[in-house]
Regions:
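Intrinsic disorder/low-complexity signature
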Residues: 1, 20-22, 86, 201
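N-terminal secretory signal peptides that target proteins for export/translocation
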Residues: 1-7
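Generic alpha-helix initiation/capping and coil-helix boundary signal
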Residues: 8-9, 22, 39
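Sec-dependent N-terminal signal peptides
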Residues: 8-16
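C-terminal segment of classical bacterial N-terminal signal peptides
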Residues: 17-27
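Short S/T/G/P-rich N-terminal loop/turn motif that feeds into the first structured element of a domain
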Residues: 29-265
Length: 265
């Protein structure tokens, strides 16, 4: 992936996992344990870079035009995330929504259904005046590698780690996460979510989300160290076979509830 796609992909997966696992909504609630889902769960991720100076107009367009049309067109939910002031592109947004079946892409999307053909054409013209780039991905949530603690409410902050794995070593990496790393997150009762790119990006990239309630949580140090101490944390990290991970990036992202919508309860 190019520089922007790689960085934004980290953030998009944030939403990805969050949507699928970070809430207790009926449409995507998960159990507190990493029990595999009955079948693959796919998500559509749209990463948008807004033109400088157009942020307020973009948000207004999202709230008053885009979201109502998506709801009318049948989309059940969509979450929007943005990089935090602590790091990342302040003009970048990540939208996450469910993919029920790939056959959905054979016809008109929810936006076009909600606006009609002429309205959709007008929407495209307006949207193109507000953004500098748009990139779409489809990802698969990896419930078998994740732990979901039932939260008191929606997560507000995520530590997003993008991990590029060496070709043909995916199974080794997944075994490490499942058997060594994720159990520590479960022990610490910290939500830890994993996703994998299917279309639109690097198929050897995984994105993990460590959910936090506030920046103050970060002052407590890494979860592994909190749970096991320095020596114990190092022992877990040393179990990862050499050469599996070729690149790692880390960022912080926050939920933008005023631009998101959830299914009715």
């Amino acid at each position: 992936m190019n520089h922007i796609s790689s960085r934004t992909f980290q953030v998009f997966c944030i939403a990805t996992l969050l949507l699928c696992g970070g809430h207790a909504h009926r449409s995507f609630a998960q159990t507190p344990t990493p029990t595999p889902a009955a079948g693959p769960q796919f998500l559509s991720i749209t990463v948008v870079s807004v033109k400088p100076g157009m942020n307020a107009e973009f948000q207004d367009f999202m709230k008053n035009t885009t979201n109502p049309a998506l709801k009318k067109g049948g989309l059940m939910w969509r979450e929007v995330w943005q990089s935090t002031a602590a790091g990342g592109d302040a003009f970048e947004y990540v939208m996450v929504s469910p993919v029920g079946k790939f056959a959905e892409y054979d016809g008109a999307g929810a936006l076009e259904k909600g606006l009609g053909a002429q309205g959709f054409a007008a929407w495209q013209t307006k949207a193109s005046s507000l953004v500098t780039s748009v990139h779409r991905f489809i990802v698969r949530t990896r419930n078998d590698l994740s732990f979901q603690r039932q939260p008191a409410g929606p997560h507000k902050l995520a530590v997003v780690t993008s991990i590029h794995v060496a070709p043909n070593r995916n199974s080794e990496f997944e075994n490490y996460i499942k058997n060594d790393y994720m159990p520590v997150m479960k022990q610490a009762q910290v939500t830890y979510l994993v996703t994998q790119t299917i279309f639109g990006g690097d198929a050897n990239e995984y994105v993990t989300l460590t959910m936090r309630d506030s920046f103050a949580d970060l002052d407590k140090g890494p979860v592994l160290v909190q749970a096991l101490g320095e020596e114990g944390a190092q022992k877990v990290l040393q179990k990862l076979p050499a050469g599996i991970v070729v690149h790692v990036e880390r960022s912080l992202s926050r939920l933008v509830p005023e631009l998101s919508f959830m299914p009715a309860q």
